Amino acid sequence: MTLRLSGIELRHSDGTLALRGLDLNIAGGERVAIIGPSGAGKTTLLNLLASALPPSAGQLEVLGADPWQLSSKRRQRLRSRIALVHQAPPLPARQRVITAVSAGKLGQWGLGKSLLNLLHPLDVSGTREVLARLDLADKLFERCQQLSGGQLQRVGIARALYQAPELLLADEPVSAMDPRLADHTLALLCQHAIEHHVTLVASLHAVELALAHFPRIIGVRDGQIHFDLAANEVDRQHLDTLYANEQLSPQPAPDVSETPWTPRC
């Protein structure tokens, strides 16, 4: 089992209970979409699965280990097997795209190789190849500040694919893309997961994209799992209850370029 959660709760430093009573199992190679209204706890759940946040209570197992029972060094080694795609990728404005993508391997490289890569990219062909899959090969040597929000999101996805993780977590990975590009990008992510037996868990605002691309749908509301169903079992009643007093249509995408930088996990 890639992910196992039992009785998980997570309370933020201000006392807010963000996740409560979560019981969840996700097997290796599964493709799972997490949907729910804004503020439901989707991003918090993904950060928990990435071992960026510790649970306040309950049992957590990620890739066969409890991250918070490991030493710092072993936990970092575990994190090198996990990729987290942020809605607003934490890419320094003046960083070149080739460096941003190759950073996906930093957790697997030693210090010397990582420093050398900053001075002179070590795998130009490999980074170009993964960017080409996302129609960004021509942006290889451009700076991140020259890219649009949707292009930055695709660079973040390219970095995750280049990392070649066992567990790929994606937080609203296509929110800044137009519908056609979002559909194409999710299809690419899912195909990669199938071909490489990668466990893929993505949070999405666009319900129609979640239902179209993911076999399993988890509905989250108020920090709790509202339903956990096969995509073909999710009906209008499930969605109406999940999004009670909410709009099903996605909100305008944020300007990724103006989002404050956050540290990479």
UniProtKB/Swiss-Prot annotation:
User: Which residue stretches belong to region Disordered?
Assistant: 245-265
One example GO MF annotation: ATP hydrolysis activity
**What GO cellular component is one of the record's annotations?**
plasma membrane
Membrane topology qualifier: Peripheral membrane protein
Note the superkingdom of the native organism.
Answer: Bacteria
Q: Which Pfam families match?
A: ABC_tran (PF00005)
Keyword DNA-binding in the entry? The reply is: no
Q: Which positions in this protein are listed as binding ATP?
A: G36, P37, S38, G39, A40, G41, K42, T43
Complex formation: The complex is composed of two ATP-binding proteins (PhnC), two transmembrane proteins (PhnE) and a solute-binding protein (PhnD).
Biological role: Part of the ABC transporter complex PhnCDE involved in phosphonates import. Responsible for energy coupling to the transport system.
**PANTHER family (alphabetical):** AMINO ACID IMPORT ATP-BINDING PROTEIN, PHOSPHONATES IMPORT ATP-BINDING PROTEIN PHNC
Would you tell me the protein name for this molecule? Phosphonates import ATP-binding protein PhnC 1
The scientific name of the source species is Pseudomonas savastanoi pv. phaseolicola (strain 1448A / Race 6)
Gene name of the encoded protein? phnC1
